[in-house]
Swiss-Prot record:
One family name in Pfam for this protein: Metallophos
The protein's name in its UniProt record: Bis(5'-nucleosyl)-tetraphosphatase, symmetrical
Gene3D superfamilies associated with the record: 3.60.21.10
EC number: 3.6.1.41
GO MF: bis(5'-nucleosyl)-tetraphosphatase (symmetrical) activity
Membership in a protein family: Belongs to the Ap4A hydrolase family.
Organism encoding this protein: Janthinobacterium sp. (strain Marseille)
Record gene name: apaH
Enzyme class: hydrolase
Task of the protein: Hydrolyzes diadenosine 5',5'''-P1,P4-tetraphosphate to yield ADP.
Catalytic activities: P(1),P(4)-bis(5'-adenosyl) tetraphosphate + H2O = 2 ADP + 2 H(+)
CDD domains xrefs: MPP_ApaH (cd07422)
Amino acid sequence: MTTYAIGDLQGCQTQLNDLLQKIDAVAPQAQLVFVGDIVNRGPRSLATLRQVRALGQRARIVLGNHDLNLLAIACGLRKPHASDTVDDIMAADDRDELIDWLRHQPLALARDNHLFVHAGVLPQWSAAQTVALSREVEAVLQGPDWVAFLQKMYGNEPSLWDDSLQGDDRLRCIVNALTRIRFCQADGRMDFKAVESLAHTPAGLMPWFDAPDRRSTDTTVVFGHWSTLGLMVLPNVIGLDTGCVWGGQLTAMNLTDRTTIQVKCPQHQKPGKN
């Protein structure tokens, strides 16, 4: 079965429609995996969320940082930023149903020797461990104490993974790796300030996928999140955030032959707003 991985949508539903039409023209039965950030910053977050959910068993998603931010806004823990575009979801009649569906989605997904995450994987983690750690977060996010979890989810520390981490620190570190990481130090310590392209990598840092002794190199990690990176295709790394909401393109990749389908996008946000 053909599978297409699709980059960050961020509420760009018109481009999602165009992309799905192009996919259906060549592979109408293809499975779809969205690498997170379904909503926010684009003009049609509600319609995008509804459409992805309506794809049913044909599609899977992993949660991105903007999706988690939506959950926090929905339960009153965070106020929308000026650049957030989720008011349509907050006012929707089916808001609670959509939020409940969203919080039951995974943060990591393994399929056919591919590991799907939104942002990245720490070098200490194998693919199997990444999925297992994701399940720890999902168990809380899908449980009765999910709002309390979101209250404690935000923060940059601990920025270095240790298997002995417990409780909120452990879950926060997992979430930050799977949904926020771009650069890290050689030991895997995460940096949350740098958002540059590889050509402007800050001294002492490296992209997470170049960290030495990365344990997930035996599988292909498929991710989004990093719009300044653009389309990145390496033997065991595929980056698919091609800046749709910033005026770039929305990208889908056939994971069998690595051919791409792209749709040009208007600029809905100006660079400089992460």
